[in-house]
């Protein structure tokens, strides 16, 4: 199971991937500590750190509200979701196209060739993905973070 949880007062997102607990921190570039904290509060770009290498960035996940897309970057590789106004999100990963059908209840399903391969649910401060193939665990963990960033962004504007 993958469980991403926003710790709003600490300004971090913790993502449990199997037995590992990833720490996801917002990106802030200002030199002034107060300006950096304010910048981090409104950031839609997060870096993930794994416990096996706590000082090394595992991935960078960002949400871009203008195009309603989530971008995941691991090293030199980059994947992005494509959004359409009335259709599902799409993602090409490993040369295979996946579609993500979302419901207003926060539940979603990831499909490959019309067959459901992963299911999950997004709340205000959590994103849980229960069933999924093992080979998709890393990208799904980053997508869970992206969904949570998107939810936090839109809740902030409410």
Stretches found by the model and what they are:
Residues 56-89:
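Helix-adjacent hinge/juxtasegments
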Residues 1-4, 31, 50-57, 71-78, ...:
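A general, composition-driven signal for non-globular sequence regions
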């Amino acid at each position: 199971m993958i469980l991403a949880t926003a710790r709003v007062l600490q300004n971090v997102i913790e993502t449990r991937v199997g037995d590992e607990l990833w720490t996801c921190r917002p990106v802030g570039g200002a030199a002034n500590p107060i300006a950096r904290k304010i910048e981090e509060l409104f950031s839609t770009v997060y870096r993930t750190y794994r416990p096996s290498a706590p000082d090394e960035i595992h991935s960078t996940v960002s949400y871009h509200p203008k195009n309603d897309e989530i971008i995941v970057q691991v090293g030199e590789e980059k994947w992005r979701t494509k959004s359409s106004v009335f259709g599902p999100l799409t993602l090409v990963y490993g040369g295979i196209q996946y579609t993500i059908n979302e419901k207003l209840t926060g539940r979603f399903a990831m499909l490959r060739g019309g067959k459901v391969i992963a299911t999950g649910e997004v709340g205000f401060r959590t994103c849980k993905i229960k069933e999924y193939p093992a080979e998709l665990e890393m990208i799904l963990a980053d997508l869970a973070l992206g969904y949570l960033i998107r939810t936090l962004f839109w809740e902030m504007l409410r």
